[in-house]
Amino acid sequence: MIDYIKSTVRNRNTIRLLEKNQYTFDVDPKATKTEVKRLIEGVFGVKVIGMNSKRLPIKQKRKGPTAGYAVRYKRMIVTLNSTDSIPVI
């Protein structure tokens, strides 16, 4: 179940969201909000009060004469209780 979370997202927008106690993760496209919520609460010992999710657009990749598509992820924005935090490296 820990395999659902692929990586944390670090860019200008997600750093701004950290001030609001919101953390952004790329997760497996098959993962549901309930599964990710239970995973984050269990692993990090925090209280999740809200979640938003979106599917990232498909990007076409080309290598030589063959073309394909990049792996697609789902992005989750997790809002934590104001007293909780997750250590971000």
Swiss-Prot record:
Cross-referenced SUPFAM superfamilies: Ribosomal proteins S24e, L23 and L15e
Protein name per its UniProtKB record: Large ribosomal subunit protein uL23c
Gene3D superfamilies the record matches: 3.30.70.330
UniProt-recorded Gene Ontology molecular function terms: rRNA binding; structural constituent of ribosome
Quaternary structure, from the entry: Part of the 50S ribosomal subunit.
Keywords: Chloroplast, Plastid, Ribonucleoprotein, Ribosomal protein, RNA-binding, rRNA-binding
Family: Belongs to the universal ribosomal protein uL23 family.
Keyword presence, RNA-binding: yes
A GO biological process held by the record: translation
Compartments where found: Plastid, Chloroplast
InterPro entries (UniProt xref): Nucleotide-bd_a/b_plait_sf, Ribosomal_uL23-like, Ribosomal_uL23/eL15/eS24_sf, Ribosomal_uL23_CS
A GO cellular-component term linked to this record: chloroplast
Organism domain of life: Eukaryota
Reported function: Binds to 23S rRNA.
A Pfam family annotated for this UniProt entry: Ribosomal_L23
